Regions:
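PRPP-associated nucleotide enzymes
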Residues: 1-116, 120-185
Length: 185
């Protein structure tokens, strides 16, 4: 799927207009519903391939991927299959049973990890995941997301030593909204 076709598909499947409160607490007139694009096999596969390519380009020495639950796990799994890199699941909090881990999967201290994210707004969720990964003794200096909403998340991550590489920026998608929502002008 080429870039323009993928952008159009993301807008068709995931772009919603209304009054939304984002995870960051900010209000927005539009919402990119990640579950609407992560649950479509063709889109998930195409995104997994693009994420794998981006990982190879921006963090070629990476040992494994990591993804915060729940939203980015499907993306990390798709990228893992495309890249043949193992991945970790970063829990928001330790579960009260079993291993009680916040980081699920197998890793070795000192390994280089690339964070996979869905939509980044303020960078808060990504930063929490990076902190969990680092507390486990792993190195994380790169995050790759499907969409950067261009609302400060990249700068916030950079302040903590993490470079954000988006597959798309919100402006890429919003430029397609008019033609997709109202194709006849």
């Amino acid at each position: 799927m080429n870039e323009q076709v993928l952008i159009k598909a993301l807008v068709e499947h995931a772009y919603l207009e209304g009054d939304f409160v984002l995870r960051s607490g900010r209000r927005s007139r539009y919402y990119l519903d990640k579950y609407r694009f992560e649950t479509v096999p063709e889109l998930l596969g195409a995104l997994g391939e693009r994420l794998a390519i981006a990982v190879a380009e921006h963090e070629p020495e990476v040992a494994r991927l990591a993804a915060p639950e729940l939203g980015a796990v499907a993306l990390a799994a798709a990228a893992s299959l495309a890249s043949q890199l193992p991945f970790l699941i970063v829990r928001k909090e330790a579960k009260g049973y079993g291993t009680s881990n916040r980081l699920e999967g197998v890793s070795e201290s000192g390994e280089l990890v690339c964070l996979i994210e869905d939509v980044v707004t303020s960078g808060g969720a990504a930063l929490q995941a990076v902190e969990t990964v680092r507390e486990a003794g792993l190195v994380c200096r790169t995050a790759i997301c499907v969409v950067d909403r261009e609302e400060g998340g990249s700068d916030e991550l950079a302040r903590h030593g993490v470079r954000l590489w988006p597959l798309f920026r919100a402006s890429d998608l919003l430029g397609q909204v008019k033609s997709v929502v109202n194709p006849h002008g």
